[in-house]
Amino acid sequence: MIEYTTRYDVKKTMYEKFADSAAQHTNEPCFYYYNNTITWAQAEKMVDLCAAGMLANGVRKGDRVIICAPNMPQCIAAIYAVNKIGAIASMLHPLSVASEAQYAVDLVGAKFAFCFDVSEKAFKGMNHLTLVRCKTAEYFPKTPYGFIANQLYKKKIKGKTAPATDVKKNIDWKELLREGKEYIAAGNEIPIAENPLAVAAIMMTGGTTGNPKGVQLCNEAINNLSYQLCDVVENVLDMKCDPKSDAMLTALPVFHGFGFALCMHVSICTGMPQSLFPQFDAKMCSDAIKKYGINYIFGVPDFFEKVYKAGYLKGIDMSNMKLIGSGGDVVPYSLTEKMDRLLKENGAHCHFVSGYGLTECVTVCSFTDPRREAPQGCIGVPCYNVEAMTVKPGTTDEVKGEDGELCIYAPTLMEGYYHDPDETAKVLVKHNDGKVWLHTGDMCYIEQETGDIYYRQRLKRVYKISGYLVYPSFIEEAYRAMAEIYDCCVIGVGEEGQTKLKLFVVKNKKFKNDDEEMLKKKIIEFGMQNLSKWSVPKIIEFIDALPRTKIGKVDFKVLK
C-alpha cells in the first residue's frame, strides 16, 4: 500500500469505520429512506444480526458474497456485515439478468447472495447458492405515506418478479436476522476482521476489453478515496465535514464505485446521514434535498439534466451547499454552465464540479476546483495523494504538452482483477521510476502549469449508457444465440454522453429473405428478455458481412 498524507485514520476496515461512527452518533439519523429515519443504533443492530446470520449459514472470512440490490437499508447493512466478518462484498447490478448473475457468481465462486424483489428470479437454478431476499418496502415508514408508497410499489413491480426456485436455500431478510439473533443467543462468538489491507469489495467493470472483470478493492483504498472528499472540503473550501449539519444524497447506485465510496462510505466515515434512493426519481430526490438540507450531491449528468429541466431546485436555499457535481459519464459543458447559474442564484458558495475516475482506483481520481468555473473539457486536477501523467499509448514513455494515455498513481489503486493476472498486468504497470501506475486506457491532455486534465477519447471498447457500463461482447454473444443471426457487432454512436448502441447483423442464410422490420422487432424483444435494458441496441442495421482487418479481427473503425 502506498504511503500518503492525511489526518484521517484510513488504516481500518470499512466495518471499523462504521462502528466508530455508530458509537459517536448512536441515536442520530444514519439513513433517510422514504420518509423513514433509521438511527445509527438501528443500523448497527441490522449489521450485527446480518453478520451473525451469515455465520450461521456457513459464510466465513475470505468468502465472496454477491450483493445484488439497489440503495436500500438492507443493501448497506449487508455490505458492512460482510466486511465485519472478513468476507468480500461482490457487487452486482440489481437488474442483472440470469446470464449476467450466473457469470458473476461463477467468476468469484460465491455460495451466498443478497437480492431484492426484482432481481430474485435471476438466481433461479443456482442450487449451490443460499439466497437472501430483501424487500424494497421492508423499511417504508409505518404511516399513511408508507402504506401508499407500498401499494404504489407493488403495482409498479407487478409481473416483474418471480421466486428463485432450485437454490440451496431461499430466505427473506427478516429470517436471516432471526437466525443471526439465535446464533448469538447460543453463545457463538462473532469474529471481527481487522486487516485494512484485505480485499473488501469486488466491483464488476470492463477492464481493458469488453469482458466484465472483478476489480478487487481493499479497505484502506476505499477509506482513502472517501476521505479525499473531506480533504477537498477542508483544504480547498476551508470548511469542515459536520455530521450535525451535513447530509448526503445517495442516489448513485452503490454497486458502482462512485456511489459505493463517494456517497455511501463518505457518509459512514464522517457520521453524516444519507438519504437512500433505490431508483432515481428527480422529484423525490429534490424533495429530500429540501427536507433534510442535503449539501453533498453527486449524480450522473442525466440526473442533473432532469432536475434542472423540471425546476425542482429553483429558488431553494443552497447557502450551506459544500459539494455538488457529476461524473460516471461525460459531463456536457452546457450542464456545468446551467448548474453554476442555479447555484449562484440559490446562494451557494461553490461551483458545480466534474469528476473523473475508474473503478480500478475505486472511483474519482480528479475533481474540478469547486472555487472556480471549470474550463471547458476539463475533468479536474488530481485529488490529494494522486499523481497523474500521460504516456505514449502502449508504452511507459511520458509525454508532455501533447495527448497521451492517462496514468494514475495513488493509494486507491485496485489489488488487481479477480483471478485474472494477465489483464491485471496490462493496466497495473511498473514504470522506470519504480512505481506501479494504472494505465487508464483514456487519451487525455495535462496542462503543465495548472495540472488541469482534459479528456480526449476512450480507448477501451466499453460504452456507458446513462452512466452504466455495457459490454459489447456480452451483447454480441447473447444475440448469436438467435437462429436468425449468423454474426453481429455492437458499436456506440452519437455524441459523448448521449451514446446509443448500434447492432450490425449478418443474417443466417435461412432467414436472408425474411422481412427486416419484423426481424428488428424480434431482435429488440429478444434483448429485452435476455439483456439489461441499457444493453439493448437502439439501432439495428443488416449487412452482408462484418468488415475485417488483415489479421481477421472485426474492423470497428469501418463500422463507425
Language-model regions, residue ranges each:
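Conserved pre-ATP/AMP-binding loop-to-beta segment of ANL
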Residues: N27, K156-M204, N211, V236-A247
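Conserved AMP-binding/adenylate-forming
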Residues: N36-I38, C50-S96, A251, L469, ...
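Conserved AMP-binding A3 loop
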Residues: T39-A41, P191, A200-Y227
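AMP-binding/adenylate-forming catalytic core of the ANL superfamily
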Residues: S96, A113, I297, A410, ...
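Conserved AMP-binding/adenylation subdomain of ANL enzymes
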Residues: N223-A247, F255-Y296, A310-G311
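Gly/Ser/Thr-rich phosphate-binding loop
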Residues: N295-G299, Y308-P375, E387
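Conserved ATP/PPi-binding loop(s) of AMP-dependent carboxylate-activating enzymes
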Residues: V381-N385, G394-V429, Y468-V470
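AMP-binding/adenylate-forming catalytic domain of the ANL superfamily
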Residues: Q529-K553
